[in-house]
Amino acid sequence: MNKLFRSKSGVLVSILIVFALVAAACGDDDSESGSSVVDTPADDTETDSPAEDTEGDSAEAAGEDYSDFKVVMILDGSAEDGGWNTTHLRSGNRMVDAFPGIDFSYVEAIEPGQPATNAFQDAVDAGADLVIGTTFYQFDMMEVADENPDTYFLTWAGFEDQPNVGHFSQATEDGRYLDGMVAGLLTESNIIGYPVGFPYAEVNRGLNAFTLGAQEVNPDIEVRALYLNTWFDPAIEQQAAEALANEGADVIAHEVGAQVYATVMAERGGYVFGYTNDWSDFEPEAWAGGFLIDWSTYYIEQVEDIIAGEFTPGISYGGLAEGWIEFAPYGPAVTDEMLELVEERKQQIIDGTFDMFAGPIFDNQGNEVIADGATIPFAERDFCCDFLVEGIIGEIPAT
């Protein structure tokens, strides 16, 4: 795994305002804060590429019992949102499979701020050995972590140093690039719609990677981006989907939560890509495919290290090569010839022989943002991007 260690720096501070604006990142904005503790996780979602469970197999074979180890996961929305939180819970379930008997529970609909601080403290008081925060809970978590050095904490997209805290983020660009290739091959209008939630680094990075992937196979495409200022609002997302379809988009990818894009594309004879969940059974004729995030590799590694007394704080960032990105089944419109191209590029990303951000790359204002011979190193991608590449119709909103 590419495990990165960064201390607080000017680069990190510069993104602080953006993270604060989207502190409820990737959750359900309409959810009320709550503290519903659930001891029995939802069933795992099957995919074509399940995470390897070699550690779990060996633990089970050895008859080891992990019932004395307690993990509590803090979700910022519903575990059944069909998106971000469902993905985290799916990864948590895979962690459970790797450690027979492990005590795993989760708490839903916890907003950043005092509700999150209270939830972290409640988890500690309940005897948690490890607490996992699935959105930008860094500041809420740090206060509790500092006062409880014998409990370990993991939080998404954080960066501050603490001996008992780890941070993690996912290289969604690996999956987005390959989804973009398929989209570029499927579109007939050469117009692809791409509604997103908020204008922060991971969103822009994925949008750029998707566009670059589509341009590799179809240089004539344009990607129309809409920033919706929400992670989940079916009414707003319905309007966005219809507006994009009316502008000629016959393919839609998205980084927001509702399934309305599939419905609209099915009605219009187009195709939809999912965001980190398998919706292939919903409007199957319109389903094109979609990458999935799997944090279980990271979760399992952290539990192993804690049990062994070898926990290492810092930032972890993983993609295809690290097993953090996989794919849902492709839809019926995706041909074997398309898949052959995608699989070849996928293997090159895993091997490190292909660099999607190799320059020269220009933004959609005509500025060279990555020079010829330059790139964005994998270790620095977590904080990209504050630009949109050429071929994207749209602007990053001011924050």
Q: What function would you assign to each model-found segment?
A:
Residues 2-13:
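Bacterial N-terminal signal peptides that target proteins for export
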